[in-house]
Amino acid sequence: MKVYLAGSFAYKDKEKTKTHQRQLEWAAHLLKEKGLDVYLPQKLHIHNAWDYTPAEWGLMVFTHDVIEIDKADVLVMLSWGKENNAGAAWEVGYAFGTGKKVIVVGLTDEVESAMILHGSYAQVKGMIGLEQYDFATMPKTRDLVGEQS
């Protein structure tokens, strides 16, 4: 099973960026230990990126991510509640719109976005929830609290 692992990982705050990147790496490790094929967008390397304008680079990243979501069987999103960025939310919406199952892993006690939760197939709490989730049977768990719709 192919998994696209979404999550916000680029912030002005360098420490927050490092923390989120480490959590995404750990989630990728947990998923790979389950025998899943994981794509982690933060690992994308565009050769000679400095040769491109920001707009050209952005389009290449966007196009590559769309291709990888299309190839995935499921999208797993690490969610930091209100700290989620537009890119991660867009990835969830795109995956939902193309009929992919979306698993949201809540990493805070914050209330989750109603749009993220209603677009998810299943929700689990924390890395332990991700580690315990059975991707063979794909249970429809609802462990997170969302905004009032």
Task: State the predicted function of each range.
Residues M1-S149:
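Conserved catalytic or regulatory cores that recognize and/or transform ribose-phosphate-containing ligands
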